[in-house]
């Protein structure tokens, strides 16, 4: 997984040159070499990986066209036209007949004029435990997904349901409630590269007081149906299970004066700093 959103934006002369290389390569492809994509695989190829025009219509009928585009696009980093042409042919040779299959975002994005990422997956920092922190985190997720990247987020940084929020004299709705917002944005709003819904993985650690609610909500498909919900299980938890020991569910002490400044979801770092945790139940 990658933590930085890298996008490609070939424009002007560079993009035109990659198109020229692609067309030159396509001329070398005989009709007998064109792989027909029919049935389910044809639909997947057309919907997910073939190049689309400004109206969303596929302009690539065969994998050979896709491979030539990807090869020419990847070769643009070479310093001279001669090297670019040489590496276009080398990349094409590797891709041909599915001998080498790169990530889906490379296949759909390389050699295009669009601002999309070449990375399939991103793990972004946990949201700061505040409304603004959650919204900023959501914006980052949406930005990555709009450029075709999948996103993973650990929500253990958010205080448990019912915990006091002094600034507004209220109580927290908890990470499961916020997870529904992330899920809705992914399922109903985002289209990755205009071809598919966003891909989201939401996580919570095994020590978080809301971990059981996080597990139970998976049974109700009407609530969080736009994300994969996963529990981060530690070696300590597995050892406790093996030895038949109790397991505490806890969270940082919200009364700590440095909570807002220091808490970022890393419980080990919090403890190492000499900070207290509050056990909610065992």
Q: What positions do the PLM features span?
A:
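Extended catalytic cores of very large enzyme megasubunits
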Residues: 1-282
């Amino acid at each position: 997984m990658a933590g930085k959103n890298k996008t490609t934006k070939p424009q002007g002369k560079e993009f035109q040159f990659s198109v020229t290389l692609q067309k030159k390569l396509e001329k070398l492809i005989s009709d007998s070499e064109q792989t027909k994509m029919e049935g389910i695989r044809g639909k997947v190829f057309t919907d997910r990986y073939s190049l689309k025009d400004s109206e969303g219509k596929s302009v690539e009928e065969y994998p050979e066209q896709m491979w030539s585009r990807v090869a020419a696009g990847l070769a643009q980093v070479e310093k001279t036209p001669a090297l670019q042409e040489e590496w276009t042919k080398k990349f094409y040779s590797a891709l041909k007949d599915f001998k080498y299959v790169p990530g889906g975002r490379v296949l759909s994005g390389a050699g295009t004029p669009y601002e999309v990422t070449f990375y399939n997956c991103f793990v972004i920092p946990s949201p700061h435990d505040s409304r603004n922190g959650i919204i900023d985190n959501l914006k980052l997720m949406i930005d990555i997904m709009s450029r075709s990247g999948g996103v993973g987020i650990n929500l253990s940084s958010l205080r448990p349901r019912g915990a006091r929020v002094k600034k507004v004299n209220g109580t927290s709705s908890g990470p499961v409630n916020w997870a529904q917002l992330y899920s809705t944005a992914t399922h109903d709003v985002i289209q990755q590269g205009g071809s598919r819904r966003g891909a989201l993985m939401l996580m919570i650690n095994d020590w978080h007081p809301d971990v059981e609610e996080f597990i139970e909500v998976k049974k109700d498909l009407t609530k969080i149906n736009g994300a994969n919900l996963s529990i981060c299980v530690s070696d300590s938890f597995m050892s406790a299970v093996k030895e038949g020991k109790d397991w505490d569910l806890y969270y940082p002490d919200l009364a700590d004066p440095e909570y807002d400044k220091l808490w970022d979801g890393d419980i080990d770092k919090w403890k190492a700093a000499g900070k207290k945790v509050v056990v909610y139940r065992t």
